Amino acid sequence: MILIDFSNVALANVFALSREFSLAEDQKQFTKIFRHALLQTILSYKNKFSKVYGTDIVIAADGKGNWRKQEFPEYKASRAKARDQSGLNWDYVFAAMDTMKEEIRTLYPWPIIELPELEGDDVIAILVKRPAVASDAVTDFFAPAGDSGPAQRTLIISADGDMKQLHSKRVQQWSPMTRDFVSIKDGWTIYEKIAKGDSGDGVPNIYSDDDWFTKPQPSRAKAVSKKLISEVHQAITSGTVDKVFPADVARRIHRNINMVDMNHIPKRFHVPVLESLDKYELKGSKHLMMEHFMQLGASQLLARLDEF
């Protein structure tokens, strides 16, 4: 199975073709470029990886709202500022993404899973962690990856570093940014990410207050040592975080566990994700795609119709 993080792949295309997108005169032209780039990219993944990972493609998209932001309002709070500084027309970007999600639902042969409060990587994590034995699905979603993970080889298409914690013998990751497989450096564990936080998502390290990335700071954040990472690891695995660490640090450890550890995606989301895929009804067909591409004058996509 090939699991595609829709937003991640879509934005990789936008940044790679930023000059072409900047020349778009209106939304229609922008979406035309976006459609062509996205579909060509997905087909390239299918052609490149299907022999090893199979021809099943599932697309995971970000839903409205975000459960993490409800628990931690500063989560990804600085993203809007970064977008403003990019020079891109983000109204065009988001409109094109919405258009393509709807086209995937109605025209193309791939399931797209989008649920309220969930990010695409949440959907991917739940699908990857799904036990091979269906009867265990309700009670044991998050069995350790590896032999108790997915029965088939799975490729995650995403540049998101959070996906590293899903790697196993049968689960690999391909980055649309670097166009290469993602590897894990020796000694890396999820406990390092918990201790250090995730600057890209606005999650500070366990020494820093919640608003570290949203307010001017008088100095650099206090560094997190390997010794501290080891202590965090031991405290979490032994269930002694609140005993070992001062109250403020312990609270931040729990904050970061909830924000970055995919084993802590709330269980209320597990069944809806799995049922969304299991009960998904594909509406697309080659006939509908052919009519659509002819109407758009998308000759290059029309020529690749048999590859969908």
List the predicted regions and their residue ranges.
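Noncatalytic, basic helical substrate-engagement surface that gates or grips nucleic-acid strands
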Residues: M1-L155, S168-F181, D261, K267-K279
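Non-catalytic nucleic-acid-binding/docking modules located in mid-to-C-terminal regions
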Residues: N47-A61, S78, A82, L88, ...
